[in-house]
C-alpha cells in the first residue's frame, strides 16, 4: 500500500491563500519542490520540501494554514525518504495545528494521523492514531477513503504484536467496500483481495482463500510481467493444495512460478506476507522482553527454507516462536538475468511489552 492517502489529496499547498505570482526566494523554492516531486529522487524531494518550509516561515504568518501545509509536505517527503523520526515530529505538529484550525474530527486530519502512525514503532499510541483516522473516515461518508484507511491500518499493524481480530477485520471490511465500489481489476481492490486471501489461508479457511487467490492470479495475468502479488498468490496456493493433499494442483502453481517473467531483470527478494510471532504467554505475564536473530534462504518460489538462529536474548520460547513465524513468511524471489534464484536473508524479531 502506498504510504500516503491517494484518495484525499490533502497536500493543500497548491492552493495558497497568498499569491505566488511574484518571484521570491520562497516561490522559487516551492517551484523547485514541485519539480522534484515529478522526479524519482526522494532525497531531493525531502531537501526541497525542507527549503520551502524554511523560507515559508518568513513568507507566511506563523498561524497560517499555508505554513502548516508546507510542514505536511515536508513530513511526507521525510517519510518517503526513510527519515521516520523527523517525519513523525512534523506529522504531530501538523495534527495539533489542524485540530485548532479545522476541528478535532476534520477530514483534513486523516493524512497526518496516518503519517504519524506509520512513522513510529508499534505501540498503543500507534494503534490509537490509526483508530482515530478510521473514525474520522467513517464520519466522512467517503467509502473509498474509509477502505484505504482500513487497509493502511491493517498493513501498519499486521506484523506487530498489536495485530488482533479487530485489525484483521479492517482488511475484510475494506475488501467488501472495494468489491462494491471498484471494478475487479482496480489495483486497490486487487491488493485487498490478496490480503484477505492470505488471511483466510492463515486461518486454514481454504475454501474461502482459494477463490480469492485465484482471482488475484486471474486479474494480474493481463500484465506483461509477473506482479509480486501474483507470485505470492501462486506460492500460497502451492502450500494450501499441499496441505489438502492435492499435489497435482500444487504442481500446476509451482510450474507457473517457474515460468513467470520478473518485474525487473535483477529483482531483489522482497517480503510479501509476514505474520508476527506469538508472544509466549508466560513471558508476557512476566513482562519478559527479548529478540531473535535469524538467517534463512528464500528459494526460487519465495518460500523460507533452512532458517537458522544466529543469536537470541530473553529465552528459548522467543526462539521457538520466531522460527515458527518465519516459516510462514512469503517472499517474491530474487531474480538474476531474468531467472529466480535462491537468496540469503537475515532478520531480527523483537519482543517488547508495551
Q: What do the predicted segments below correspond to?
A:
Residues 323-354:
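Short, positively biased Gly/Pro-containing turn/loop motifs at secondary-structure boundaries
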Residues 21-69:
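N-terminal leader/linker segments that initiate helical-solenoid repeat arrays
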Residues 36, 71, 78, 113, ...:
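Residue at a conserved register position within TPR or TPR-like alpha-solenoid repeats
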Residues 60-68, 102-110, 140-147, 182-189, ...:
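Helix N-cap/loop-to-helix boundary motif
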Residues 299-335:
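A short, well-structured alpha-helical segment
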Amino acid at each position: 500500500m502506498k504510504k500516503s492517502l491517494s484518495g484525499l489529496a490533502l497536500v493543500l499547498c497548491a492552493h495558497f491563500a497568498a499569491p505566488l505570482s511574484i518571484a521570491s526566494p520562497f516561490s522559487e523554492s516551492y517551484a523547485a519542490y514541485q519539480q522534484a516531486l515529478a522526479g524519482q529522487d526522494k532525497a531531493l524531494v525531502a531537501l526541497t520540501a525542507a527549503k520551502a518550509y524554511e523560507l515559508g516561515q518568513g513568507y507566511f504568518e506563523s498561524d497560517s494554514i499555508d505554513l502548516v501545509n508546507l510542514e505536511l509536505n515536508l513530513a511526507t517527503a521525510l517519510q518517503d525518504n526513510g527519515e521516520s523520526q523527523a517525519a513523525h515530529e512534523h506529522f504531530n505538529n501538523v495534527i495539533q495545528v489542524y485540530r485548532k484550525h479545522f476541528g478535532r474530527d476534520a477530514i483534513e486530519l486523516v493524512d497526518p494521523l496516518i503519517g504519524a502512525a506509520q512513522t513510529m514503532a508499534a505501540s498503543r499510541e500507534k494503534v490509537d492514531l490509526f483508530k482515530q483516522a478510521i473514525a474520522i473516515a467513517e464520519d466522512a461518508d467517503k467509502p473509498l477513503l474509509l477502505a484505504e484507511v482500513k487497509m493502511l491500518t491493517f498493513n501498519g499493524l499486521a506484523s506487530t504484536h498489536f495485530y488482533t481480530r479487530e485489525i484483521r477485520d479492517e482488511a475484510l471490511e475494506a475488501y467488501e467496500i472495494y468489491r462494491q465500489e471498484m471494478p475487479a481489476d482496480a489495483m486497490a481492490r486487487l491488493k485487498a483481495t490478496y490480503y484477505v486471501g492470505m488471511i483466510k489461508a492463515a486461518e486454514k479457511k481454504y475454501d474461502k482463500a482459494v477463490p480469492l487467490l485465484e482471482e488475484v492470479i486471474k486479474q494480474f495475468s493481463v500484465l506483461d510481467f509477473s506482479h509480486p502479488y501474483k507470485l505470492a498468490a501462486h506460492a500460497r496456493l502451492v502450500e494450501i493444495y499441499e496441505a489438502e493433499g492435492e499435489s497435482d494442483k500444487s504442481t500446476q502453481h509451482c510450474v507457473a512460478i517457474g515460468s513467470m517473467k520478473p518485474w525487473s531483470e535483477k529483482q531483489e527478494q522482497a517480503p510479501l506476507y509476514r505474520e508476527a510471532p506469538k508472544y509466549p504467554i508466560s513471558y508476557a505475564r512476566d513482562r519478559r522482553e527479548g529478540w531473535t536473530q535469524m538467517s534463512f534462504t528464500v528459494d526460487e518460489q519465495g518460500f523460507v527454507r533452512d532458517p537458522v538462529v544466529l543469536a537470541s536474548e530473553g529465552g528459548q520460547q522467543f526462539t521457538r516462536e520466531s522460527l515458527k513465524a518465519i516459516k510462514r513468511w512469503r517472499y517474491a524471489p530474487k531474480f538474476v538475468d531474468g531467472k529466480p534464484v535462491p537468496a540469503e536473508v537475515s532478520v531480527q524479531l523483537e519482543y517488547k511489552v508495551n
